[in-house]
């Protein structure tokens, strides 16, 4: 009788599926600089890695203007086809948006079976589909993907079925992509209706937070700047923090106590990126608007990234587009533990960068190690208290509407005590609210003649 030896060490490990190999393509026009194109291509490579692919090669075509048929011209397409065959690449990713006709023309001209041509927006949508966890996130991704994909089905018919799974095809699924336009429109309408309900619930939650009177701070910044890590370090939130682009799609809010004892609400938000598709901004508007409703913006930057200045520009532009560009802002340079060189020099650089604006404050931290986080908390406290005062109001019971006014004006009410004749409320208010209720401050100094 045969003897079967059980030995775990003899087990053959399961083969990991091979990552799809991709050629990255961009064009350098008269309106671009070589440095900008290189930076954008570096970012595209990171996006591909996050999506589960690997870079086989890069191609940059210098042209005075894009070619209408193939973007890069017929000669360069032939060169691209040879490159894909030699490198066994199954994917071509363009660092710009392509028209449906350009995608079809290039796939036909390259002539490699099962090779896909996608653009930067399709890749970003794919990553969002990969990382969507909550019901809201999945609905937002599907809506954005359908809105972007629907016009790109033009003339392809059932050819879409040959794509199979993989990068650029995640999300709604093949059955939806092969549906006719009327079916897709019905699905888009249904998604918008579902999201309207979700957004209503989000507004209710936001109003509930408003009634608490606690200052709201939105942590915003470029994707992978360390926003989730910072929220975890400050509050122990325990949310996913990965070294990947767009690891966080759903905002998370946690209470945080400042050194002086005052509580605030910290919200982690979706990361920004250059060339963020506008249909994606539209689909995720309710999520991105957490920054709009914040009292203070904590703008986090990865100081170890060589493209930090460009990322700051992109983040500020998107904040302005969302209507949050004028908010009081604390600029926080993260990952200082990775920065080689003189730390004092780095601090001076940060201070010099923002010395011309009182509304801008900046400091360096490491969210990973906690270095500088105490100073960050103190800076937030200082920013919050600007123009505010802590007052003990003494309100006659007959004028209890003044207490309701405190809440409606979103004052930070610490305590309320009801007496036989008076209501005693301790609250932190700004100058405007204090002016409305100053008659209930027993310690107020009354100017002569008032």
Which sequence ranges carry the predicted segments?
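Conserved nucleotide-binding/hydrolysis micro-motifs of P-loop NTPases
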Residues: 28-32, 63-65, 97-100, 122-125, ...
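Short alpha-helix plus adjacent loop in nuclease-associated cores
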Residues: 121-141
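Switch I (effector-binding) loop of TRAFAC-class P-loop GTPase G-domains
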Residues: 5-10, 200-202, 209-215, 233-265, ...
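Flexible beta-alpha connector loops of hexameric P-loop NTPases
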Residues: 31-36, 66-70, 131-137, 175-176, ...
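Conserved C-terminal guanine-recognition region of P-loop GTPase G domains, centered on the G4
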Residues: 10-11, 33-50, 77-86, 95-115, ...
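C-terminal-of-GTPase-core extension/linker across diverse P-loop GTPases
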Residues: 1-24, 45, 151-225, 231-232, ...
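N-terminal accessory targeting/assembly segments
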Residues: 1-120, 124, 445-450
